[in-house]
């Protein structure tokens, strides 16, 4: 935010031209002059209010120049929708993807996916190892490793396919791995990778169960590898701005937080396409279901579960680990909440009667008695009426996305409370009006840059598809992978390190446990157990 000045040459020039135009309308002119002066005073008051209240910091710059740093060899384990996005974040996309997005950019000026990808920093790494249990995806990952259309030009080397992840981990030339498998494989692969000395980027949620989270945490701490959990929201500029606002006390004491999810499409409810080439010859089903508590033979049901795994607790964590985890981690980033004392949740399968066992309507309550705070989460997969997220304080409320109505992605507004103690004098004098925000953060344009599907728009509104640095549109997944690689090279901790990853994993496990058992769950930090 620029500093405000009482003297503005352009304003003075506008005023002179305005007054000159009113010279021939004496009666109305006097009224409008008074109105002009009042509006100018109000504008100045609001400007002074913001400079008085908000001590704003700039977002971190996009630091480039890794060409002289250590070259890293990475492997990908699980090249599905999320895995392919993370590999693009590292600088590797399939030829089919680059060809399609290039054509889309020519036909639609708002579609900036290709330009955003090509303007990424070259992260000075090579994709050298691929493991996926579906032949089609494994071949796509190899194609991505060899595609010359990428930031930095021709890749140094291509990838080799491994049938089992342990074979990939045995390659001593691989420095780090991205784990983007279904949730039920996260803990095994992460633990084995850490024991093999590989750094790990693990997609969220960290684990499927609470016990797995404990094992992953202990192994990462013991081995000393660098772990980044896949919450790219840690790179979203709006969250950093929101933290600044809250740390400065603009909201006053905060006692209630409301987080929401609204989707209304089969895709948004994880009813994903069953690939026509998926069969017993192209899919290693036995390996896929190896860690799951319940096993079934390969067939039509197995195909559904392989491609729509988030619909079953055998493989995923439902709304808790998939969607709530994003909003919780963002709020944890903003407010340093940590693990709640109590968690309770309820819901049901009310709309998608397709054999799934995870709910499509789900609510959770997290209680922080030591912080005098309760967090509520409400989700439905059968209504697209976006409600946004609210952080409610005694003096003001922050609304992020959804109902903030700021016309941009990843933004927020702060509106004063009528009964505020902090703003009482300003409210009484009219300097602050509860109908208007006292602070608005609105990055980028009012367009949803080429995003068309409801699910993509949901992620865009959460700031998970792109963010801004120095006015430049950047993929937060790219920034998150970069943060991980920079931390590996520098021996530092990434933004979503094992400590905050553990907080997310335990919190989501508590909420899931409450739903499955129908009881309130308590966290015992001293003994590291759920009661």
Where are these regions (language model features)?
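Contiguous beta-strand/loop segments that form the cofactor/metal-binding neighborhood of enzyme cores
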Residues: 52-55, 240-241, 250-499, 503-517, ...
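Extracytoplasmic/secreted proteins, especially bacterial periplasmic and envelope-associated proteins
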Residues: 81, 85, 122, 136-140, ...
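Hydrophobic, small-residue-rich alpha-helical packing segments that form membrane-like cores
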Residues: 174-178, 194, 199-257, 262-266
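Non-transmembrane alpha-helical segments in soluble domains
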Residues: 19, 87, 91, 139-142, ...
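Structural recognition of the beta-strand scaffold that forms the well-ordered cores
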Residues: 74-77, 128-131, 178-179, 201-202, ...
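Alpha-helix capping and helix-loop boundary segments enriched in small/acidic/polar residues
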Residues: 156, 180-184, 204-211, 230-233, ...
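Soluble non-cytosolic domains of exported or imported proteins
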Residues: 132, 180, 233-236, 475
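N-terminal glycine-/serine-/threonine-rich beta1-alpha1-beta2 phosphate-ribose binding loop
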Residues: 2-14, 19-199, 214-226
